[in-house]
């Protein structure tokens, strides 16, 4: 629903390539800790005692490690509030103490929304127009409160009754949101307010930004069109949704398998050969799933690899038809909305601004990456002794990796996970945040009913003054039927709560709360009440041992980077605390949203950061300098074998995405295969074969064409920026724990959320003395700025094998 009005910048978790691959016992009866918080700004009996964060950092730090590494410790710690007589709702939401509470939550929120809509529609005085941006931001917040939380709970909660109740609450508010999308009076009133200098002169910068975001969202919802065109817009939007879902779920090859003589499968695991073997000494190699990937990597016969490669990259005609219909409908939608193409419509509010600028970035990136690609391919071609073909790449990469592993890879690397228990990694994240930003993670015993599973840990984020600033629910361990992909969810955005809201709440019901019972705090400067960001982190790590001395969950280097990536999103939500929720935290342009998370990956294995946390789970000895050097050599070696070609593959996918979505709306029928082949021939170092019939049509398997249409470049764009900031702000790791570097990054990037242009953030972090930003030329963005980021390149992005 990210493009729906009045929930202007709601972001689904980005499922990036990285994410898809990555104590001393406390007294048993300790008083609940207290922080400088206003759980209620008006007199009423609190459901729980206030907390106290006056204990030492050392105790909290030790507890943080143990709540994740010891199940016994966690059970004892988490049961300290089990005697609390009144259950707390899910994530402290006062309504969600039972499945029926979702209906109440949705209805109460709906009534508040309706009151705001009536107020906005009836506005006629200057004072009423001056509050309009804030009023509509609150309307957006009320919708998000229900939609975001219900959407998360219906996916994560194990109880079918709760899932169903959350789904119904989600549907109710989503339907109401669609009603608002057709309420032309809201658009008219907001435009009237935004056009009046006597109104806008009194607006803060945040109010002006939010007003423009909402006006853009109204426009994208066709509210300004005549009724018949608006209906056409709705019909097209529905068609696109249905086609997109069919395209994502309907990926299929033209052929289900390739028949191969079994004696030509030498190199493939014999157990797998037996699984696909048929009675007549042939085998049916499937064209989807793991087996074709393993065949391309290990089968010695080049002809077999060629057959498997071509078949596994050729989509069915039915799937290609779905894609081409989707592209046609999107082009028509853009034309109806007054745009040259779907890409022009989608990119108008992104950092890139236009498909031409994206093209500048991608072509510059191809150029900066080409030398590294040639180096990698020349090494593989030398192994083959003949021209390298697309179906050779995986095979010879595997051969090189095996050679490296046998000849050079240090045996001590197999012991690295022993130094990465989940508890020590969380401890390291807290210590890093404390060093860079002056905030840390403090375990908090959950109240009865607060979490959706007993394994969910609650962490409170506190600053150096002991002030509570955020809540994180960590659902990090695997369990049956849990989705395996790592993700960050914003369950409640940060926002300033007005005194009018507090008074309204008090007048309605003494038991009600202006933030539905969820975490709030008083801003020490403005003395206003704030709703605190509430975040959920979901991963799928193995559980620690159940007995007191059991083995903790040990993470691979890749899993550590994954956790740092997701915490990068979290710290953006934590520190990007704006006054208005529409631009808080991660609610920023799509092509800026991945920057904090990608940058965080660099910190995971920086030597000075490893020194903060990498300790053996049993002996507590630190990771040795020799092991750190071995890890670095391993990443560099693997990156030099395939890193640049992997980068090229991502660039090509982004180019294909742009080619499809930048076509003019009146361009007629789209031949997606011809365009795909054109991009491959023009930009790939190992282009698809031009002499096969039918030609390969891998685009039918590219599901992100629906979810990230015209914006697939965003991830590699943010990687290029992150690499630049890592080198120029954090000294390529030399200042990885330096407070001055952290404050600079926080003040120029993180604290703004979506309330500042991404270009201004990047330019501010680099400074005007930086050669890439000489005279502040990055501030305004534009085609040349995009080209400049492309010149920064991606390096090889070496990863552990």
UniProtKB/Swiss-Prot annotation:
Which Gene3D superfamilies does the record match to this protein? Answer: Collagenase (Catalytic Domain), Neurolysin, domain 3
Its Gene Ontology cellular component terms are: mitochondrial matrix
Which InterPro entries does its entry note?
Answer: M3A_MIP, MetalloPept_cat_dom_sf, Neurolysin/TOP_dom2, Pept_M3A_M3B, Pept_M3A_M3B_dom
Q: Does the keyword Metal-binding apply?
A: yes
Record's keyword annotation contains Protease: yes
- Catalytic activity from the UniProt record: Release of an N-terminal octapeptide as second stage of processing of some proteins imported into the mitochondrion
What EC number(s) does this enzyme carry? 3.4.24.59
Where are the catalytic residues?
566
Q: Define the transit peptide region by residue numbers.
A: 1-42
The primary location reported for this protein is mitochondrion
Annotated GO biological process:
peptide metabolic process; protein processing involved in protein targeting to mitochondrion
Family according to the record = Belongs to the peptidase M3 family.
Q: Which PROSITE patterns match?
A: ZINC_PROTEASE (PS00142)
Which Pfam families does the record match to this protein? Answer: Peptidase_M3
UniProt-annotated binding residues for Zn(2+): 565, 569, 572
According to UniProt, the name of this protein is Mitochondrial intermediate peptidase
Cofactor binding summary note: Binds 1 zinc ion.
Protein's gene: oct1
Q: Which domain of life is it from?
A: Eukaryota
| Compartment list | Mitochondrion matrix
Name any cofactors this protein relies on: Zn(2+)
For this UniProt record, the keywords arranged alphabetically read as follows: Hydrolase, Metal-binding, Metalloprotease, Mitochondrion, Protease, Transit peptide, Zinc
The free-text function statement in the UniProt record for this protein reads: Cleaves proteins, imported into the mitochondrion, to their mature size. While most mitochondrial precursor proteins are processed to the mature form in one step by mitochondrial processing peptidase (MPP), the sequential cleavage by MIP of an octapeptide after initial processing by MPP is a required step for a subgroup of nuclear-encoded precursor proteins destined for the matrix or the inner membrane.
What Gene Ontology molecular-function terms does this entry list? metal ion binding; metalloendopeptidase activity
